[in-house]
């Protein structure tokens, strides 16, 4: 993960099938890291964009969460991640805001980024939560991301410049909780008492010196 301006970008490894034999706890470890990383970003007042290859649902879509969805989506919900980019299916799809794997008024928008190379895939299907779905079988495509003060503006275009989709995703910076100085009257009184005690000791010593004279 890294910061660029006011945005915190997180790149997740979702190739658990290829790595499971070598590191069976990969998803648990990555989810634990992600929890800490998003907490730090929230504390720093950063907006978040997540990048991951596999979508959080099975491919082709069958209504079930993929393994990475089971581990990562609860954390996206917990930290109010506004935008997640995925790939894998070589199609473009943009969901409504998602919370608890359900359409919601406020939640995470998931965008499948289409294809940039020559390979298309006719096995992808439109999800019930997709606002826009497009399978770029005719030519490659690309996306642009424009960061605005209170939103992320995403545009999807074909290589010839034809606009496929454009959307503004609400993305206000999280409110950073500041700890105000607490007035500890006890500590103040204690400090004042210590000052008085020191003055009393000095006065007592001075009186003893005068008596000795």
Features from the language model and the residues they span:
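Polycationic, low-complexity disordered segments in secreted or periplasmic proteins
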Residues: 190-213
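Asp/Glu-rich intrinsically disordered low-complexity tracts
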Residues: 178, 184, 194-197
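Small-residue (glycine/proline)-centered packing/hinge motifs flanked by hydrophobic/aromatic residues
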Residues: 124-127
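Metal-dependent phosphoester/phosphodiester hydrolase catalytic core
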Residues: 1-122, 132-136, 144-178, 182
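A composition/secondary-structure signal for short, hydrophobic, low-basic-content segments
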Residues: 49-50, 84, 188-190, 203
């Amino acid at each position: 993960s890294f910061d660029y301006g006011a945005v915190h970008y997180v790149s997740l490894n979702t190739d658990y099938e290829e790595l499971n034999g070598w590191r069976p706890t990969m998803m648990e470890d990555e989810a634990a890291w992600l929890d800490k990383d998003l907490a730090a970003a929230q504390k720093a007042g950063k907006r978040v964009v997540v990048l991951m290859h596999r979508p959080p649902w099975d491919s082709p879509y069958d209504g079930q969460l993929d393994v990475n969805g089971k581990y990562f989506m609860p954390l996206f919900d917990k930290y109010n991640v506004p935008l997640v980019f995925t790939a894998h299916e070589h199609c473009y799809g943009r969901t409504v805001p998602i919370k608890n794997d359900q359409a919601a008024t406020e939640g995470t928008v998931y965008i499948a980024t289409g294809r940039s190379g020559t390979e298309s895939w006719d096995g992808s299907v439109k999800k019930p939560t997709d606002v826009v779905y497009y399978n770029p079988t005719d030519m490659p495509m690309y996306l642009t991301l424009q960061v605005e003060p209170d939103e992320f503006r995403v545009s999807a275009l074909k290589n010839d410049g034809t606009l496929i989709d454009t959307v503004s995703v609400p993305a206000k910076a999280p409110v950073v909780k500041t700890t105000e100085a607490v007035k500890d009257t006890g500590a103040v009184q204690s400090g004042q008492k210590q000052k008085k005690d020191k003055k009393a000791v000095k006065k007592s010593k001075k009186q003893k010196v005068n008596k000795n004279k």
